[in-house]
Amino acid sequence: MKDLFSIEGKIALVTGGSRGIGEMIAAGFLANGAKVYISSRKADVCDATAKRLQEEYGGECISVPDDLSNLDGINALADKISQDDNLDILVNNAGASWGEPIDEYSEQGWDKVMDTNVKGVFFLTQKLLPLLRKSGTAEDPSRVINIGSIDGIKTGLFDAFSYGQSKAALHHLTRVLAASLVKENIIVNAIAPGPFPTWMLSTGVGGGGDVDIDWSSIGDTNPRGRVGTPEDIAGLAIFLSSRAGAYTVGQTITCDGGVVASS
């Protein structure tokens, strides 16, 4: 029972790991002894975040930038990760959103969101299955954690007509993948975050992407009276990645301060 929540020595890939929720999870993994790869579309940002996280938390944080909205980028990332001998944890966090009024909502916006949030998750998981299969055992399965959203459970507040739909699809994809892979010692679950101080939420509430804004107006509307913290999301990801979470399969777990429960 002593090491129930240990991820010491595990190898993890966190997509969308250069900022926001992905960065929070990557930081939590590093602080608890995992070797972490982070990926994002912008190489300079990804490199800078990996360097900063490694300096702050120690361990090994490796930047592997790629665009995961298309198969070329997915294949390139899988090839980079395959240079390691195995992969214990895959966090599919890379995501996109697009906001326009319904009468103006474009095919470009629809496809960008669906390609990144649904198709990209499936095909990256597919390409990394050999490594995940190699790492997983009956006692300590490999883990896939898909980052969904409460907007895939309840109606969202913004004119992002493909975002919530993509996350609802991701939640169902999580169940399908979990049923398919559980007997191969690969466990798949999803986390549905609520409000966290991220670039994406900041753009939606008029903050222009600045994460250092006053979040109290958002936090005050939350049942817990605040927005989420890195400890909240990283703690849940660590649970799902550790021995403690080895019997939790195919679930979408909200991390939202009670928003969905109170809606």
Task: Report residues per predicted region.
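Short C-terminal tail/terminal secondary-structure segment
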Residues: 2-4, 238, 243, 249-263
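Conserved glycine-rich cofactor-binding loop
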Residues: 11, 18-19
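Substrate-binding pocket helix/loop in short-chain dehydrogenase/reductase
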Residues: 101-102, 106-114, 218
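Alpha-helical segment proximal to the catalytic Tyr-Lys
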Residues: 130, 179-180, 246
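Short, small/polar-rich loop/turn modules that mediate ligand/substrate recognition or access, typified
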Residues: 182, 187, 248-250
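Short, flexible catalytic-loop segment of classical short-chain dehydrogenase/reductase
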Residues: 193-203
